[in-house]
């Protein structure tokens, strides 16, 4: 049986056990060798002897099958006091198997990582003799393992001294490679522990350690792992008991656990009785290759003396191992080894360079050294610049009052207040206009995700206007992209380069309808006279004068259309029985009159009267002269409409024909406020058209 842990039949059950010793027994068969094994039941102190044929190799599938049959739960499902001895033994065995599996997987990843690092580190050779490293031949390795298992757990300090002096007398040898299979088997068949002195002793001994031989580290692939482990022991670990060199190879994948795991073990003095069971014999095993024997001989003797006495162990080291849980020493070994792996590989390189400063290096690759100096990473200061969402001159979407989202230009920005002054994109943009100040939250970037949806919404009421704005912005971006123009959209609109786009708004078919900001139509017209300035600060009541005139004109429409009170008067004018100044001007006019006074301000009222007059013309079509039939619309607007309105005013208001005609010529009676607003509108239109005419 080559396995360290087996399954044996004890008390009618398969119990996991640890092999303590094996001895060959006589057998009738010459081919098969029988062994007598002495095993210890895991988590129990029971030691039994049995034949090798009565045991099975311990594997995970068998343990899980037994646990499933017993209905065992996970490790954290119940307190340890409630578990049976058989259940504890199975869980200890399962934990050992899991540790083996993780160890083998991590060693594979460790080899790959060190292989990549070895390609980037320059090799260095020291004049000092390399550290001693001993191992037995591969053929004698099984015998060596048997000797370790059969040897006594404790040795006298004199024996350890002899082994140390023997190590010193041997000649220095180069690091030899050990196959991965031998490494794995040595990890499985050896257990060990270490003592932890005080921090001050650790610091003193760090100064006395020899530096690592970098050339030996990078020469052979497997030697890299051994030497890196040795350096970690020299830098961070206190003096250790002589251990197998194979046990120092630990994968870097086990770095995750912190050093608290090892420190917590110092507080368990009651378990120190099992301390000596896991220390190997220094006389038979290879010496520690990481320690200088000439410097560390007193410390090694003190270690062996401390290991020989359990009582002194509890007083000096306070390191203990549980006798009831044999897997505890194994897990502690793993956690302590993880602490040695915390040294970064770059620190190894720096340490090797520091130790070889005064030595003459051999076979130095200068190009590699130069590359290392160039690849040295200096401290980096990462500056996070805040990207402002809006900038001056940026085109955005802005929603104002009842209008939909409309393209606008940012004139200025106040960062602290997070506000921007914007102007709508329209046919009469002017950089001198005062924009409206709004919060950033009310703005959207022009190329946002909702761009198409905003355009479609604006097309519902401003189809031509929004299309013109989009074409203006697209043309501006094309000019910026090709480099033919540099500047903001406002500057582009005022320049001659934008005239092909601006001239579209001057066409008769274009509806000049754009959203207006409050300061365009309200404040600027009100600045015409002092009277309107005062009114801008007062609450303006709605104008009722126009409504009163519409009601009075409604009576005139009823008299003309419904009562047909003007029909006889109109027929008399057409027949020539009554004279009319409007008929004379119509006959003498050489061209179409540019302006006609309608008197009616409501278009509905005017349409109603014109339709009635067309019916009258159809009735008298037979008797109408030929010169009237050629242009009926002109005859209705210039002759019949004024005569009908004058006749209705005379009849409704009780005036004679001359007074009614004078009232018609005077037109509607406008109020003072209506006149001011109308004059201000005219002046504003003239001012607005003046810059555009100069640009052309």
UniProtKB/Swiss-Prot annotation:
This is PWWP domain-containing DNA repair factor 3B. Keywords: Phosphoprotein. It comes from Homo sapiens. Residues 119-143, 278-303 are annotated as: Disordered. Belongs to the PWWP3A family. The modification Phosphoserine is found at residue 128. The gene is PWWP3B. Residues 392-453 form the PWWP domain. The lineage of its organism: Eukaryota, Metazoa, Chordata, Craniata, Vertebrata. CDD domains: PWWP_MUM1-like. Residues 119-128, 290-300 have a biased composition (Polar residues). It comes from the Eukaryota.
């Amino acid at each position: 049986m080559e396995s360290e842990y087996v399954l044996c039949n004890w008390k009618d059950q398969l119990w996991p056990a640890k092999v303590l010793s094996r001895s060959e027994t006589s057998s009738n068969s010459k081919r098969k060798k029988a062994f007598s094994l002495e095993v210890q039941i895991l988590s129990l102190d029971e030691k039994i002897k049995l034949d090798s044929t009565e045991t099975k190799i311990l594997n995970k599938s068998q343990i899980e099958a037994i646990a499933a049959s017993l209905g065992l739960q996970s490790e954290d499902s119940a307190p340890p006091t409630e578990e049976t001895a058989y259940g504890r033994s199975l869980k200890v065995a399962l934990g050992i198997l899991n540790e083996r599996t993780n160890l083998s997987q991590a060693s594979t990843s460790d080899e790959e990582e060190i292989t990549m690092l070895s390609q980037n580190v320059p090799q260095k050779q020291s004049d000092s003799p390399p550290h001693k490293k001993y191992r037995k031949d591969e053929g004698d390795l099984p015998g060596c393992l048997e000797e370790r298992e059969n040897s006594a757990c404790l040795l006298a300090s004199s024996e350890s001294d002899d082994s140390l002096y023997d190590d010193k007398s041997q000649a220095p040898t180069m690091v030899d490679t050990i196959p991965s299979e031998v490494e794995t088997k040595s990890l499985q068949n050896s257990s060990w522990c270490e003592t932890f002195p005080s921090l001050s002793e650790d610091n003193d001994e760090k100064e006395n350690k020899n530096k690592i031989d970098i050339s030996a580290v990078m020469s052979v692939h497997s030697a890299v792992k051994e030497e890196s482990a040795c350096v970690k022991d020299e830098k961070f670990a206190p003096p250790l008991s002589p251990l197998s060199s194979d046990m120092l190879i630990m994968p870097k994948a086990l770095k995750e656990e912190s050093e608290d795991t090892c420190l917590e073990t110092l507080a368990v003095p009651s378990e120190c009785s099992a301390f000596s069971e896991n220390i190997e014999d220094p006389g038979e095993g290879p010496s520690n290759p990481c320690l200088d024997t000439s410097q560390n001989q007193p410390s090694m003797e003190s270690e062996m003396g401390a290991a020989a006495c359990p009582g002194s162990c509890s007083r000096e080291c306070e390191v203990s191992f549980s006798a009831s849980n044999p897997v505890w020493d194994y897990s502690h070994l793993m956690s302590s080894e993880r602490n040695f792996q915390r040294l970064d590989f770059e620190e190894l390189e720096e340490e090797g360079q520091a130790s070889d400063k005064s030595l003459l290096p051999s076979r130095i690759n200068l190009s590699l050294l130069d590359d290392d100096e160039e690849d040295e990473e200096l401290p980096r200061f990462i500056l996070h610049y805040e990207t402002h969402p809006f900038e001056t001159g940026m085109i955005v979407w802005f929603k104002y009052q009842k209008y939909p989202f409309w393209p606008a230009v940012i004139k200025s920005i106040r960062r602290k207040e997070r506000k921007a002054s914007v102007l709508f994109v329209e046919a009469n943009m002017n950089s001198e206009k005062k924009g409206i100040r709004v919060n950033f939250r009310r703005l959207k970037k022009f190329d946002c995700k909702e761009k198409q949806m905003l355009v479609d919404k604006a097309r519902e009421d401003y189809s031509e206007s929004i299309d013109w704005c989009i074409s203006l912005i697209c043309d501006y971006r094309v000019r910026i992209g090709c480099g033919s123009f540099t500047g903001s959209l406002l500057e582009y609109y005022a320049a001659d380069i934008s005239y092909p786009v601006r001239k579209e708004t001057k066409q008769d078919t274009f509806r000049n309808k754009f959203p207006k900001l409050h300061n365009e139509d309200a404040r600027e017209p009100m600045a015409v006279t002092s009277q309107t300035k005062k009114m801008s600060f007062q609450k303006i009541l709605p104008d009722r004068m126009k409504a009163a005139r519409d009601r009075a004109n409604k009576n005139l429409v009823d008299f003309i259309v419904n009562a047909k009170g003007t029909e006889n008067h109109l027929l008399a004018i057409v027949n020539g029985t009554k004279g009319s100044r409007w008929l004379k001007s119509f006959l003498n006019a050489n061209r179409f009159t540019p302006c006609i006074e309608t008197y009616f301000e409501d278009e509905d009222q005017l349409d109603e009267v014109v339709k009635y007059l067309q019916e009258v013309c159809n009735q008298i079509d037979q008797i109408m002269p030929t010169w009237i039939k050629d242009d009926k619309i002109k005859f209705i607007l210039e002759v019949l409409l004024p005569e009908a309105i004058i006749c209705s005013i005379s009849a409704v208001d009780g005036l004679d024909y001359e007074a009614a005609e004078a009232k018609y010529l005077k037109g509607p009676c406008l109020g003072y406020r209506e006149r001011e607003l109308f004059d201000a509108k005219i002046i504003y239109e003239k001012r607005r058209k003046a810059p555009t005419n100069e640009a052309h």
